[in-house]
Amino acid sequence: MRAHGRSAMTVALGTTLLVQSSLACAECDPAKSAEPIASRFETHGDTVYDRNTNLTWMRCSYGQVWIENGGCSGSVKLLDWDSAMGLRLPGNAAWRLPQKDELGSIVATNCKRPAINETLFPGTPSVQYWTSTTSGPSYAWVVFFRTGMSTWNFLRTTSFAVRLVRTGP
């Protein structure tokens, strides 16, 4: 039993290290222009409103919890596409999985690992995020926040991260 516990601890530590390495600070290129944050985005605690797209985003990935003045805490929960499409937050049914272009609108093209503004979306891991945009009967689009690129060739049974959005402020 003792050896079993030690193996579980090793696996847990390995998983923690993997997650921590994907949460390292973004690498941003100062030579590429970044959009001024203040003119486009308004932060409201655990949400951020994008004036350009009229969308409000959860600042934390699904599974994480917003801590005022502390960012996002906890582990990102990975879901298959059907589960992600069925997510409903208590008290507000307006939250949904974003379309490919919507999720692509928050990619920071001057950054990678993650390719997102970490002031607005702290704790975003450099992993794939589901979109609601399908590609045939078995596939859906994802945005890979390691690079900011979108791709369509992932089976909907695969588990990826989720960031929820709603229309309006």
Regions found by a protein language model. Give the residues of each.
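Glycine-aromatic-enriched surface loops/turns that form tight recognition elements
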Residues: 2-6, 20-96, 100-169
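Bacterial N-terminal signal peptides
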Residues: 10-20
